[in-house]
């Protein structure tokens, strides 16, 4: 028998050696693994129509929750929990682990791409017009407004939407600036203005109010183009933590299936958007490296 085998400490040494040879470092559970195993995902919403909000029954509704449900349900993820916060807290809350992904209409911008990773685009939300029912002046673009000097256009003071109208050539003499959405809509209903410019999402939120009557969305609407010929618009997507690339990639696979089947378009139209708001033919990577767009 060897000296080592006669050593009383030998069994402990042998166990330690074998344990060291066979032990495998424990792998931390990823967000994707947890979501798939628990069949549940938690999303961040800012409780605003049409992005992500609570309906009259207290259930989460809106465009992006509907897309997330449709994307993840085939994987067995059928429970959608939510955390409500201000829009400004969406990215900080995501990074702090308060929820797994955003569903708040967060636009893809180069600045935001430095903090989070995005899914492929799910919507284009550009400018739009609210007009009197029947669109009596046949307004479908800023050019239509510009070409009719009698048209009085309302815009929110300091908004990008009003700035786009001016940039498109609408004379400032035709623009009336208001403090908020409510005052603009009241002016349109009272026929003090002929049209109101605001974002497509704000139009949907406005028209969801059953008390708003006598006005409609100008459809279609031809938006302002940038120097590259693309619509001047916010492009939205779902935001993820930078470490959750596997979750983002899985979500993108499911999102592409929704696009190919036409289900994404149906969700977009059912939410109140139009075909003008379908996602662009650009990737999140391209948008992350593009010049800044409206937020």
Predicted ranges, named:
Residues 89, 105-114, 166-167, 194-230:
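A ligand-binding cleft/hinge motif common to bilobed small-molecule-binding domains
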Residues 160-175, 249-295:
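Ligand-binding clefts/hinges and TM-proximal coupling segments of bilobed small-molecule sensing domains
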Residues 42, 47-50, 60-74, 128-180, ...:
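Bilobed "Venus flytrap"/periplasmic-binding protein-like clamshell domains
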């Amino acid at each position: 028998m060897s000296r080592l085998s006669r050593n009383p400490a030998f069994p402990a040494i042998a166990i330690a050696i074998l344990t060291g040879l066979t032990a495998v470092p424990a792998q931390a559970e990823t967000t994707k693994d947890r979501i798939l195993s628990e069949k549940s995902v938690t999303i961040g919403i800012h409780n605003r129509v049409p992005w992500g909000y609570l309906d009259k029954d207290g259930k989460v509704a809106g465009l992006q929750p509907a897309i997330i449900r449709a994307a993840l349900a085939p994987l067995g993820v059928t429970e959608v929990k939510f955390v409500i916060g201000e829009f400004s807290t969406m990215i900080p809350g995501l990074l702090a682990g308060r929820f797994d992904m955003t569903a708040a209409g967060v636009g893809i911008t180069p600045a935001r791409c430095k903090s989070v990773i995005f899914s492929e685009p799910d919507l284009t939300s550009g400018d739009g017009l609210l007009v009197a029912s029947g669109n009596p002046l046949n307004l479908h673009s800023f050019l239509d407004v510009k070409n009719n000097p009698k048209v009085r256009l309302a815009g929110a003071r300091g908004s990008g939407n009003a700035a786009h109208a001016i940039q498109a050539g609408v004379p400032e003499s035709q623009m009336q600036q208001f403090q908020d959405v409510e005052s603009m809509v009241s002016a349109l209903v009272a026929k003090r203005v002929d049209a109101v410019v605001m974002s497509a999402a704000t139009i949907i939120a406005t028209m969801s109010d059953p008390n708003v009557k006598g006005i409609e969305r100008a459809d279609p609407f031809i938006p302002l183009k940038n120097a590259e010929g693309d619509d001047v618009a916010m492009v939205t997507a779902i935001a993820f933590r930078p470490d959750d690339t596997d979750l983002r990639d899985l979500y993108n696979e499911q999102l592409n299936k929704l696009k190919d089947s036409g289900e994404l378009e149906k969700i977009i139209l059912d939410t109140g958007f139009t075909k003008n708001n379908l996602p662009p033919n650009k990737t999140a990577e391209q948008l992350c490296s593009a010049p800044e767009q409206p937020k």
